[in-house]
Amino acid sequence: MVSVSTCFSALRDRAQCALIPFITAGDPSLEITAKALQVLDQQGADLIELGVPYSDPLADGPTIQAAATRALQKGTRLDAVLEMISHVAPNLRSPLILFTYYNPIFHRGVEPFLQQVAQAGVQGLVVPDLPLEEADTVLTQAAAVGIELTLLVAPTTPRSRIAAIAERSQGFIYLVSTTGVTGMRSKVEGRVHELLLELQQVTDKPIGVGFGISQPEHARQVMEWGADAAIVGSAFVKRLAEGTPEQGLAAIADFCRSLKTALTPVD
């Protein structure tokens, strides 16, 4: 399986901005999640972010919160998510990034959690509520099992911390495009361009922009501003949840293709 860093390196060689879709594990079911991962992989995703449903998702907007609630109500738990991943990941071209809050990691233990995640075939990890001051232990232990822990920079992040986050972040840097939670918005805030420029002054690591990227034109905008990846979550989660499972899978396939087209450089 290809690492997150290797994937970004190959994309940079082709001057290609990555597409990173996000879906919630277990919504509408783990069986459909497995199919959705394969659909996204086949329809142009460069990397895929998979959210572990959690009861108190502070960074998530209403669409992803509702998906997590539905998944938990159906009994979706971490062990079942990892079991599903272990069957699907070996057949994916795209590296798989697990999005989880810190509480499940803490309760399981950092080392056992990371070992199980690595054994399942996960290549990257995003923990939105992990403070920088507590990240070093997770970073070290994640690297030991071949997992890259990506850290987040937000519009509210003090400039004094941006360089420290950029230095520690592995795989890429996750740039949050707006204050507040995830969700679909009508446009990408202009502040994102400024933040991209600030980050590019202190690091040459890839930068992915997420939160509020919900339309092909949003993805193209962040690409034109110099982002290395467009991360799209709520718009995929919403489409997958609408209609029958088969209709949801068809909808995310179409949407994935439209985003990929928007991110394809014009000769």
From Swiss-Prot:
Main function: The alpha subunit is responsible for the aldol cleavage of indoleglycerol phosphate to indole and glyceraldehyde 3-phosphate.
Xref: InterPro entries: Aldolase_TIM (IPR013785), RibuloseP-bd_barrel (IPR011060), Trp_synthase_alpha_AS (IPR018204), Trp_synthase_suA (IPR002028)
Catalytic activity: (1S,2R)-1-C-(indol-3-yl)glycerol 3-phosphate + L-serine = D-glyceraldehyde 3-phosphate + L-tryptophan + H2O
NCBIfam families: trpA
Gene that this sequence comes from: trpA
Keyword Cell division: no
Pfam families for this protein: Trp_syntA
Keyword Lyase: yes
Active-site annotation: E49, D60
Pathway(s) it belongs to: Amino-acid biosynthesis; L-tryptophan biosynthesis; L-tryptophan from chorismate: step 5/5
Name of this protein: Tryptophan synthase alpha chain
Domain of life, source organism: Bacteria
GO molecular function ontology, one term from the record: tryptophan synthase activity
Family: Belongs to the TrpA family.
HAMAP family named in the record: Trp_synth_alpha (MF_00131)
Any single Gene Ontology cellular-component annotation: cytosol
